[in-house]
Design a protein with these regions (language model features):
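ATP-dependent carboxylate activation and anion-phosphoryl transfer catalytic cores
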Residues: 1-93, 97-110, 115-119, 143-144, ...
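C-terminal amphipathic alpha-helical interaction region
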Residues: 111-114, 123-131, 137-194
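Periplasmic-binding protein-like
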Residues: 280-286
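A conserved helix-loop-beta module that forms one wall/lid of the active-site cleft
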Residues: 308-378
């Protein structure tokens, strides 16, 4: 967030900060909509962490004055506080409009321009109109609400302008294909800001969604996959466009792609880039969980975007297959159908369901959210006291359930990286973890080839991996995590995307797995 905010993209303030915040995964409107106790709010204001911006908004919502916030926060500059106070007042205006019955379809053009120009995302506007509904546990706004705001904005022909980054700080003229989106304080012209000369372009334009900021759960390894995917796209004679919001990675170097967009990796920002480019294809499986999480929402938006002239193919594994691999209940059905063994587990959407699942499975349990980065929120719980503490922090909704699994103690864990063209599977490597199962793969040491696995289990791993790739219809890369207890093999999870071990596998084996996977997503076969 600091690296992004320091670039000062977008205007007026605090637009650069809101863009930076939207780039961090958990946003201001996410954090600030929680029913915070007063003491916790004071702590969030006082201690300089990524929670502070959300706390600033909440303080102004509760009627704090600028001097109150300045005193509690230890001296945040008044210049910034005035702007956050203004945004909080504008958010209150949106909320009041919702209380008076305004729906997304009713938003006037003037208000839409002002709200977008101030830095509010479509999701934040939808949430504010709904009054930030909470019910003890965090309640997320429905995607349909955000979709309604986007449709109204497009109906009003309000789109961001894309500005080129001056990479030479005005010392001399420099033309670099770096862009960022801005609504310029609400005065944005109407209509889609297409790439200049787009009608003369002859090559297909393929967009690669990057992995975003490097943080716990999302490392630089995913950027490796994005860079090699771009190389494969260009080798095939297409234009490669990257959307990424991390200025310190290789994928955002000036000569990596044909065009680069420094924008948050959200559905709203990605859709605007796709419209600007009139993109022919998009690759989501190389940017880790951040990118693959866009698969289902983007698939839901495609009919609307196609109505605006976009003829986009979601390259590689289908969004439905991504959901089948990622959704616990669907994958359990898949595992039974294919003949795979999984630890005993349940999906829970309410606190009551979580406790019922734990009682049914018995301690110890492994509990984690679905669709998250790098094991965020994953815990091994051994008693009711630990469960109570975990539930105080849990975010639950039907859209974001918790996965409760039997914990396999004294088990060995394996990682498998592979690629598939839909009919044939190439296994890049089978990696044995040094630590026992339950240590997240991002924190574990692994080695190639495995040293402590019987030939029988090794053959079963290869067989199950091929079954999973072909039966799921994977096109591109995928990663499977297995556990072995005694001579019994279990599937822990399947990730229909590149993994953090891809660079290790490629360098250890000499097989450019990411580049091969990219070519498969674009329609080539392994036999080729």
């Amino acid at each position: 967030l600091k690296a992004w905010a320091s670039l000062e993209y977008g205007q007026p303030h605090p637009r650069p900060l809101t863009m930076a915040d939207a780039s961090g995964g958990e946003t201001m409107d996410d954090r600030a909509s929680e029913p915070l106790p007063e003491a916790l709010l004071i702590d969030w204001l006082r201690i300089p962490t990524d929670r502070r911006m959300g706390a600033l908004f909440e303080a102004f919502r509760r009627g704090y004055s600028i001097e109150d916030v300045r005193d509690v926060s230890g001296g945040v500059t008044r210049w910034f506080l005035h702007r956050f106070e203004k945004m909080a007042a504008l958010e209150t205006e949106i909320r009041a409009a919702g209380e008076l019955g305004m729906k997304a379809a009713d938003i006037p053009i003037g208000e839409m321009r002002r709200w977008k120009g101030a830095g509010f995302t479509d999701l934040h506007i939808a949430d504010a109109l709904a009054g930030f509904p909470t019910s003890g546990f965090k309640s997320l706004p429905k995607d349909s609400d955000e979709d309604a705001v986007m449709r109204r904005r497009h109906e009003l022909e309000i789109h961001p302008r894309f500005r080129m980054v001056d990479s030479c700080a005005a010392e001399f003229a420099a033309v670099t294909p770096y862009y960022y989106a801005t609504y310029e304080g609400g005065s944005a012209p109407t209509g889609i800001d297409h790439v200049p000369g787009l009608e003369n372009f002859t090559k297909q334009r393929i967009v690669v969604v990057g992995s975003g900021p490097i943080r716990i759960g999302q490392g630089i390894e995913f950027d490796y996959g994005c860079v090699h995917a771009v190389g494969a796209i260009r080798d095939l004679g297409h234009e490669a466009i990257i959307i990424n919001n991390n200025p310190e990675t290789v994928s955002t170097d000036f000569d990596t792609s044909d065009r680069l967009y420094f924008d948050p990796l959200t559905l709203e920002h990605s859709a605007e880039v796709l419209l600007r480019e009139k993109a022919h294809g998009i690759l989501l499986q190389f940017g880790g969980q951040t990118a693959i999480n866009l698969a289902l929402p983007l698939a839901g938006r495609l009919p609307h975007l196609e109505g605006m002239g976009l003829n986009l193919a979601m390259q590689g594994t289908t969004p439905d297959a991504v959901d089948e691999a990622s959704d616990r209940e669907r994958f359990e059905e898949f595992a039974k159908r294919v003949g795979l063994r999984m630890p005993n587990g349940r999906t829970a959407s309410t606190p009551e369901e979580v406790r019922e699942a734990v009682q049914e499975i018995g301690y110890p349990v492994l509990i984690r959210p679905s669709y998250v980065l790098g094991g965020r929120g994953m815990e091994i719980l051994s008693n009711n006291r630990q469960l109570d503490a975990y539930m105080e922090e849990a975010y639950l909704s039907p859209e974001r359930p918790l996965l409760v699994d039997e914990y396999l103690g004294n088990a060995m864990e394996l990682d498998v990286d592979a690629v598939c063209d839909g009919t044939e599977v190439l296994i890049g490597a089978i990696m044995e973890h040094l630590e026992e199962a339950g240590i997240h793969s991002g924190d574990s040491t692994c080695f190639i080839p495995p040293q402590n696995i019987s030939k029988k289990i090794l053959a079963q791993v290869e067989d199950w991996t091929k079954k999973i790739g072909i039966q799921l219809g994977i096109k591109g890369c995928f990663n499977i995590q297995y556990a072995i207890r005694g001579e019994t093999l279990y599937v822990l999870e399947v990730n229909p995307r590149g993994s953090r071990t891809f660079p290790f596998v490629a360098k250890a084996t000499g097989v450019p797995l990411a580049r091969i996977a990219a070519r498969l997503t674009l329609g080539e076969k392994l036999a080729e």
